């Protein structure tokens, strides 16, 4: 066979190999989704896939493969001709193991044919000598394998004897395990009975504790409602006191404005007293804000059952402290107002004396 004929044979094999490679991408998943791949593969190729799928389904019931073979050849022809056939390679479908094996065998066949067609007489003779040498090696290897098999049989007999000894030990161990399991079951039954009795006792104790805690919770809620109402009343009183204090401050400011023509020293003293009153008012406002914030924090902490009594006592202490602060401030404020009235009377007497 000359090189031209060899090239033709290889060309035919390459064409067949390309057809097998293209048809390997036509998996069952591709056939099932042929309608969805119409835009990707084109109308003709999608219709061919749908027709091929229908023929395969009908061939399962009729056992007629002629139409399937003809459809396969037509599908291979379209795959070779269509430029969109390469897009099948990017689909997330795996090819079957059988088609991959066929493709591999056909590639090996093509390589073997190419090697045979391009091999000279000398190379063929050399290959035959190499084949004879390999065959001799294989025969020697087979003989060695038979010897090893005989040795393996002897070893198996020895292992079977050892296995019999091991089986006796295993039976003895199983008997001991059975005794341990029996004693374990008895211990388990005793432990379960004890645990069940302890569980009943714990349930009874828990119910008693739950009733006690429920009563304490109801009492704490009633105390919280009372404290809230008391705090609300105190807050109303504080607002009234603040309003009265503001009115008194306005009166004092008017009196100070009327005495602008007085001496500079008296004016400075009046301003100092006025600033002191404002500072006390700011302290009062700050104390009121702190009391309000503490009340919010108290209500939040009251939701915790473990701190109910402690929080109620703490709030009572804070309210008593606030009342003492307010009373102290009010006594100081009354003293300041009485002092201001006395000073105003002195100023009036001084003015009357000057007029005389």
Curated annotation (Swiss-Prot):
Coiled-coil region(s) at which residues? 126-167, 197-287
Q: Which UniProt keywords apply?
A: Cell projection, Cilium, Coiled coil, Cytoplasm, Cytoskeleton, Flagellum
* UniProt feature, compositional bias: Low complexity: 178-187
Residue ranges, annotated region (Disordered): 173-209
What is one term from the GO cellular component aspect held by the record? motile cilium
Start and end of every IQ domain? 319-348
Q: Which InterPro entries match?
A: DRC10 (IPR042815)
| Job of this protein | Component of the nexin-dynein regulatory complex (N-DRC), a key regulator of ciliary/flagellar motility which maintains the alignment and integrity of the distal axoneme and regulates microtubule sliding in motile axonemes.
Q: What is this protein called?
A: Dynein regulatory complex protein 10
Instruction: Identify the gene encoding this protein.
Output: DRC10
């Amino acid at each position: 066979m000359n090189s031209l004929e060899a090239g033709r044979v290889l060309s035919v094999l390459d064409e067949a190999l390309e057809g097998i490679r293209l048809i390997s991408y036509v998996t069952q998943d591709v056939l099932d989704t042929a309608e969805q791949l119409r835009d990707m593969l084109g109308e003709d190729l999608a219709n061919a896939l749908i027709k091929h799928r229908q023929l395969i389904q009908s061939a399962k019931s009729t056992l007629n493969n002629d139409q399937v073979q003809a459809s396969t050849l037509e599908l291979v022809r379209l795959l070779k001709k269509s430029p969109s056939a390469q897009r099948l390679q990017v689909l997330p479908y795996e090819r079957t193991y059988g088609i991959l094996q066929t493709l591999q065998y056909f590639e090996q066949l093509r390589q073997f044919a190419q090697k045979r067609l391009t091999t000279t007489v000398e190379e063929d003779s050399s290959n035959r000598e190499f084949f004879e040498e390999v065959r001799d090696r294989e025969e020697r290897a087979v003989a060695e394998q038979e010897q090893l098999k005989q040795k393996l049989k002897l070893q198996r007999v020895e292992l079977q004897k050892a296995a019999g000894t091991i089986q006796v030990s295993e039976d003895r161990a199983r008997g001991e395990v059975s005794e341990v399991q029996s004693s374990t079951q008895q211990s388990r039954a005793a432990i379960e009975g004890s645990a069940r009795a302890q569980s009943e006792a714990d349930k009874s104790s828990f119910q008693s504790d739950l009733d006690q805690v429920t009563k304490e919770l109801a009492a704490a809620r009633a105390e919280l409602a009372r404290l809230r109402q008391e705090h609300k009343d105190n807050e109303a009183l504080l607002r009234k006191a603040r309003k009265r204090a503001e009115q008194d401050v306005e009166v004092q400011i008017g009196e100070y404005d009327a005495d602008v023509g007085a001496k500079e020293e008296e004016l400075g003293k009046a301003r100092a007293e006025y600033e002191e009153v404002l500072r006390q008012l700011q302290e009062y406002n700050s104390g009121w804000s702190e009391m309000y914030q503490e009340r919010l924090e108290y209500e939040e902490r009251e939701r915790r059952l473990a701190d109910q009594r402690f929080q109620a006592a703490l709030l009572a202490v804070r309210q008593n402290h606030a009342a003492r602060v307010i009373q102290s401030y009010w006594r100081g404020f009354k003293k300041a107002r009485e002092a201001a009235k006395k000073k105003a009377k002195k100023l009036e007497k001084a003015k009357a004396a000057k007029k005389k």
